[in-house]
Amino acid sequence: MFAQQYDHSFNDLFNQYVNMETSAADGKDSALSEFDQLFPLDSLSNDCGDLAPTVSTPKCHQSPQPWSNEWSLQYDGPAADHFAFHDTVHPSAISDVNLNHFEVPSRPTATHALSISPSTPPATPRRKPTQSALITPKTIRHRSPNERRSHLRKQSFSPSLMRSSNLSKSRMAYPEAWAQRLQNFSLHNSEDRLPLSPPPSDALIQHENMPTEQIMNQSRDSAEMPPQYDARLYHQSPSVPMQSPSIAMSARQQQHYIAHPSSSALTNSSPSSADDIFSLSHSSDLHSLSSWQSDSLHASSLPFTPDLQGQESQWWSPMPSRVAQQQAAYLASPTPVRHMQNVGSQNDIMQGGLMIQFNPSYDMSADHSFSSNMLPTSSQKFDTSYTSSQVHDISRSSSSLSPKTGTSPRDTHHGSISKPTHRRTHSRKLSSQSMNTPKPAKAPSSSSRGSNKSVSVSFVNFTADDSKKILTGVAPSGSSKTKARREQEARDRRRKLSEAALRAVRSAGGDVEALEAVLC
């Protein structure tokens, strides 16, 4: 039959997928490309059976009723979109028919499972998985292949994987069903169904990550969501704004995720992985955040929209270090932003005026001080670790400013640096003068032998009172020896002049004693 051909054709593919590196970026694309090559999209069928694909269509559903009702396929039921959470399992689970021979030899093979009667329940329908806690995309990505294989073995015969549309056919064309589900998810976005895309990633929350009872409770009540899955799973408006070109379709898909809680996990309907989803928040702006939240969430008729906003903090609290802590600083709400803009416009008006009434610790000419005064008030609700370093540095620089100075912290910084440089140069000058002080000290000692009147004269000012200094003194230029020689020559000249004057007086018949008494 077809099941045995399927076993031979998918052994290598399953082994390659399971042994693949879980953190590889191309792991999902390679598996998807191989499935696309094997299954043509033109041959379509809605048959579902033991080997049903792991990605559920909106038309294929299993109601959480007794096992006689579970084996009948429900079309367009009221809970058709709520139990699809079972099917977010890796495509490697579809080839677990091979593994079932090793786990339970007495279990019927895939050939007999195709023609099993509708009244027979599966072997282990209510077995709880070992991991029942909610696993974030980071922890899912780092699971070893052995753990995944063990989980898939346990869940291989779950009712979600063994549902069938018409078991009376006693046959299931697996490629046609897979191609049908691929096309339903990729092309039927116009329907009011869950547009879950076929490429599975490591970030998909699998069926073994939550207990079966919780899934049953989710499918019974479509309006209520369990407290650990409602807001933390689906309300991602502050962190995942839709920046892609198909923003309208992505927003509508997000609405389908919120309207049908149990049919999705932490992943969006786009084929991107969790890394791409969570990295969008860093490149997003506040306007796109507010617009996306108001358009996609509030526009949709959701009875639990206030609960989504109320439990937003619970979604971020158990997250590991995958999402950076600086992300919350980027996600300031639009209200503080408007407050900052209004204050900035007021400050611009105040800068244009006289700037008389100002806080002494608030410097408006410095742009950094404005950000230091405003950023802590806007980021108190989110995360101040991103702005703490900047605020400390800025407040340190702004506190060093005096209230009356209008200079920026950079100018004061340079001014404080320039003061020690002036002190250094002044001290150097003093040291050079102290080294050169013995040389000027010799001049008074050498000139003390002379007239010692013109020693302190450093310049010549030609006035009426300077006649005696010019005649009797010596020019201050030259060394001490030159000064001494010139002083000696001046004394000799004065002596000669005095002697010539005395001779002239004697020759004229004057009184020489009376003249000497007047001159001396």
UniProtKB/Swiss-Prot annotation:
<feature type="compositionally biased region" description="Basic residues">
    <location>
        <begin position="420"/>
        <end position="429"/>
    </location>
</feature>
<feature type="compositionally biased region" description="Polar residues">
    <location>
        <begin position="109"/>
        <end position="118"/>
    </location>
</feature>
<feature type="compositionally biased region" description="Polar residues">
    <location>
        <begin position="155"/>
        <end position="165"/>
    </location>
</feature>
<feature type="compositionally biased region" description="Polar residues">
    <location>
        <begin position="378"/>
        <end position="392"/>
    </location>
</feature>
<feature type="region of interest" description="Disordered">
    <location>
        <begin position="468"/>
        <end position="496"/>
    </location>
</feature>
<dbReference type="InterPro" id="IPR040112">
    <property type="entry name" value="WetA"/>
</dbReference>
<feature type="region of interest" description="Disordered">
    <location>
        <begin position="109"/>
        <end position="165"/>
    </location>
</feature>
<keyword id="KW-0183">Conidiation</keyword>
<dbReference type="GO" id="GO:0048315">
    <property type="term" value="P:conidium formation"/>
</dbReference>
<protein>
    <recommendedName>
        <fullName>Developmental regulatory protein wetA</fullName>
    </recommendedName>
</protein>
<comment type="function">
    <text>BrlA, abaA and wetA are pivotal regulators of conidiophore development and conidium maturation. They act individually and together to regulate their own expression and that of numerous other sporulation-specific genes.</text>
</comment>
<dbReference type="GO" id="GO:0030435">
    <property type="term" value="P:sporulation resulting in formation of a cellular spore"/>
</dbReference>
<comment type="similarity">
    <text>Belongs to the wetA family.</text>
</comment>
<feature type="region of interest" description="Disordered">
    <location>
        <begin position="378"/>
        <end position="454"/>
    </location>
</feature>
<keyword id="KW-0805">Transcription regulation</keyword>
<keyword id="KW-0804">Transcription</keyword>
<keyword id="KW-0010">Activator</keyword>
<feature type="compositionally biased region" description="Low complexity">
    <location>
        <begin position="445"/>
        <end position="454"/>
    </location>
</feature>
<keyword id="KW-0749">Sporulation</keyword>
